[in-house]
Amino acid sequence: MLFTDYMANFLVGYFSVLSSIMPLLAETSSTGEGLKLLGAGVAIIGVAGAGIGQGAVGQGACMAIGRNPEMAPKITSTMIIAAGIAESGAIYALVVAILLIFVA
């Protein structure tokens, strides 16, 4: 079988599946519903910032423990507090996104 035959079979199968799914993808809600979900997606961007912040905190703690192993317990406790503060922003972003999806 030639490559063109494989491609023809693939395209026929792809478009047959696509034609059966397209009616299900038709617009069934208002623009407000879409904007609400878009706002929830924008709100969840705050989670990425919290992840970057926690990564920076962990990196700094590992570097500090590597330079001064005797201070490991104090550095670890400070790192956990800083990670908790960074995580609070992610929790707030998640709460806002959930409120936008289910309440607004």
Swiss-Prot record:
Q: Which UniProt keywords apply?
A: ATP synthesis, Cell membrane, CF(0), Hydrogen ion transport, Ion transport, Lipid-binding, Membrane, Transmembrane, Transmembrane helix, Transport
Q: Which Pfam families match?
A: ATP-synt_C
Which InterPro entries does this chain map to?
ATP_synth_F0_csu (IPR000454), ATP_synth_F0_csu_DDCD_BS (IPR020537), ATP_synth_F0_csu_sf (IPR038662), ATPase_proteolipid_c-like_dom (IPR002379), F/V-ATP_Csub_sf (IPR035921)
**In the UniProt record, does the keyword Membrane occur?**
yes
The subcellular location is: Cell membrane
Give the record's GO CC terms: plasma membrane; proton-transporting ATP synthase complex; proton-transporting two-sector ATPase complex, proton-transporting domain
Q: Where are the transmembrane segments?
A: 37-57, 83-103
Q: What is its main location?
A: membrane
Q: Which PROSITE patterns match?
A: ATPASE_C (PS00605)
Q: Which GO terms describe its molecular function?
A: lipid binding; proton-transporting ATP synthase activity, rotational mechanism
Which residues does the annotation list for site: Reversibly protonated during proton transport? Answer: 87
Membrane topology type:
Multi-pass membrane protein
State the family it belongs to.
Belongs to the ATPase C chain family.
Q: Its quaternary structure?
A: F-type ATPases have 2 components, F(1) - the catalytic core - and F(0) - the membrane proton channel. F(1) has five subunits: alpha(3), beta(3), gamma(1), delta(1), epsilon(1). F(0) has three main subunits: a(1), b(2) and c(10-14). The alpha and beta chains form an alternating ring which encloses part of the gamma chain. F(1) is attached to F(0) by a central stalk formed by the gamma and epsilon chains, while a peripheral stalk is formed by the delta and b chains.
What does the UniProt record say this protein does? F(1)F(0) ATP synthase produces ATP from ADP in the presence of a proton or sodium gradient. F-type ATPases consist of two structural domains, F(1) containing the extramembraneous catalytic core and F(0) containing the membrane proton channel, linked together by a central stalk and a peripheral stalk. During catalysis, ATP synthesis in the catalytic domain of F(1) is coupled via a rotary mechanism of the central stalk subunits to proton translocation. Key component of the F(0) channel; it plays a direct role in translocation across the membrane. A homomeric c-ring of between 10-14 subunits forms the central stalk rotor element with the F(1) delta and epsilon subunits.
Q: What is this protein identified as? A: ATP synthase subunit c
Task: Look up and give the organism this protein is from.
Answer: Mesoplasma florum (strain ATCC 33453 / NBRC 100688 / NCTC 11704 / L1) (Acholeplasma florum)
